[in-house]
């Protein structure tokens, strides 16, 4: 599905009955979380709350509440087509040299697409139709959700943060939650290895006493949002990839108060800065783990300016014990990851991140095993190849006769093909999500790899068991007269 901006996407979802307008008054304080959660768990539509008490602004939730809507946001019609996006990313990440003239000619469409990705810069953008400055800046006028009873304050959850490090031309996009502190201040919660945090660290080293410019987009088009959470190659900007998904170049405009660029069709843009050394305690908040996280200090974002479209829409979500919207996104992006992994490791048959594993903390991989120790190589590959998996705590590797997405299959393989001592790999002192309170030190913990493959000579001294299967002729014969037996 192709679309121009968030409003066009909303209109097309509504025409397909994939979005529901809620005219009854629903409060962003806890109530929207409960309504959105009930609808998401039933596989229901995206929600547009048009009657938000005490606020003159509608709220959009559950935009990516089904895999189908994630696929539509990426310009496709089904989850199956997401594999093609993964193949495209794999080709852009590590292009193969042409094998000849015919092969080179066949690669021209991809080259043409890549060349057409560059963003288009415009002035007079819709997102700057209205401008709040100085005393007009008031974040409390936005219907920012309070998601859970123990949350310390309202929380911006779909803030698309744009930064740029010193001496860099490429702008980084990331989605980081932001705690409301006051009318013009938020707390920017980003982990130290994320792009925005790295840009800020580099800035402080280069300009230790100068303010760091930041822009936050609320209500970007889905392709731009999804590009920010997709493993885009470092040589390609997220804006360029979003243009590829959308089928047209991303329109960007320069911020009024700094030289960062934001989507021209964004609903709301926050412009401001981080002051080196100015931090505040963030949290606690209910998170995607299903628990409240501990309090930790992060930089304070001072908002100097708010710009917005006519009648802006506030885009929001909640996070909690799966399934939630991040978990659904994880299921969809799982399909994008597979071709990326398979290009580097062709022996991988399937790769699965169960949503109940908080989107990324556990992975099941099936392979065509080729040599002793092969499973351990795949474990190391998962942990190191894509930065999206640096927080994956558990990796289970199985043979290709196992369905990675069927726990009955996986548990059967684990209990019949694993010796706990021989087939368990423990790696200590590795990067761990600081929200993972199970680790002994914040941000640092262990990982476990489990080899549930059949063992080859060199891995065992015993004769390995042969799986029981029925004779094919008997199977076909019985299936042929099954309907005559009077059995269901």
UniProtKB/Swiss-Prot annotation:
Q: What does this protein do?
A: Catalyzes the decarboxylation of 3-octaprenyl-4-hydroxy benzoate to 2-octaprenylphenol, an intermediate step in ubiquinone biosynthesis.
Q: Which family does the record assign?
A: Belongs to the UbiD family.
Origin: domain of life: Bacteria
Active-site residues from the entry: 287 (proton donor)
Name this polypeptide is given: 3-octaprenyl-4-hydroxybenzoate carboxy-lyase
Q: Cite the InterPro entries for this sequence.
A: UbiD, UbiD-like_C, UbiD-like_N, UbiD_bacteria, UbiD_Rift_dom
Which GO biological process annotations does it have?
Answer: ubiquinone biosynthetic process
Q: Where in the cell is it found?
A: Cell membrane
Its gene? ubiD
Species for this entry: Legionella pneumophila subsp. pneumophila (strain Philadelphia 1 / ATCC 33152 / DSM 7513)
Instruction: Write down the membrane topology.
Output: Peripheral membrane protein
Pathway, according to UniProt?
Cofactor biosynthesis; ubiquinone biosynthesis
What EC number(s) would the UniProt record show?
4.1.1.98
């Amino acid at each position: 599905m192709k679309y121009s901006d968030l409003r066009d996407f909303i209109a097309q979802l509504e025409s397909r009955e994939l979005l529901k307008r809620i005219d009854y008054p629903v409060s962003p304080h806890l109530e929207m979380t409960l309504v959105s959660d009930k609808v998401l768990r039933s596989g229901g539509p995206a929600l547009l709350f048009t009657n938000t008490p005490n606020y003159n602004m509608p709220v959009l939730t559950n935009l990516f509440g089904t895999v189908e809507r994630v696929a539509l946001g990426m310009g496709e019609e089904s989850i199956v087509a997401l594999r093609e996006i993964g193949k495209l990313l794999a080709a852009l990440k590590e292009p193969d040299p042409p094998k000849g003239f015919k092969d080179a000619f066949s690669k021209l469409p991809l080259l043409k697409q890549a060349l057409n990705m560059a963003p288009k810069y415009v002035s007079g953008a819709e997102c700057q139709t209205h401008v709040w400055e100085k005393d007009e800046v008031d974040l409390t006028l936005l219907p920012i959700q309070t998601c859970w009873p123990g949350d310390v304050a309202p929380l911006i959850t779909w803030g698309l943060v744009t930064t740029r490090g010193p001496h860099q031309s490429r702008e980084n996009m990331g989605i980081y939650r932001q705690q409301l502190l006051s009318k013009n201040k938020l707390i920017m919660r980003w982990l130290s290895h994320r792009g925005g945090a790295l840009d800020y660290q580099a800035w402080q080293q280069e300009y230790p006493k100068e303010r760091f410019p930041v822009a936050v987009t609320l209500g970007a088009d889905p392709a731009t949002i999804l590009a920010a959470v997709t493993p885009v190659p470092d040589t390609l900007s997220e804006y360029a990839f979003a243009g590829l998904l959308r089928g047209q170049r991303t329109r960007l405009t320069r911020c009024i108060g700094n030289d960062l660029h934001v989507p021209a069709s964004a609903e709301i843009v926050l412009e401001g800065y981080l002051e080196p050394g100015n931090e505040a305690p963030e949290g606690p908040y209910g998170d995607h783990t299903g628990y409240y996280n501990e309090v930790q200090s992060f930089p304070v974002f001072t908002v100097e300016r708010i710009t917005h479209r006519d009648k802006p829409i506030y885009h929001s979500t909640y996070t909690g014990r799966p399934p939630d919207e991040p978990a659904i996104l994880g299921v969809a992006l799982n399909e994008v990851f597979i071709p990326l992994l398979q290009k580097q490791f062709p022996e991988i048959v399937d790769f699965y991140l169960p949503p109940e594993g908080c989107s990324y903390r556990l992975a099941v991989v099936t392979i065509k095993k080729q040599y002793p120790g092969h499973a351990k190589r795949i474990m190391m590959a998962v942990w190191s190849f894509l930065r999206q998996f640096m927080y994956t705590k558990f990796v289970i590797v199985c043979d290709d006769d196992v369905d990675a997405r069927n726990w009955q299959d996986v548990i059967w393989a684990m209990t019949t093909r694993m010796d706990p001592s021989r087939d368990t790999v423990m790696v200590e002192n590795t990067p761990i999500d600081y929200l993972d309170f199970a680790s002994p030190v914040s941000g640092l913990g262990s990982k476990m790899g489990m080899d549930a493959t059949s063992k080859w000579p060199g891995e065992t001294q015993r004769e390995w068991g042969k799986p029981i299967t029925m004779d094919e002729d008997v199977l076909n014969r019985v299936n042929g007269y099954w309907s005559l037996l009077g059995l269901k």
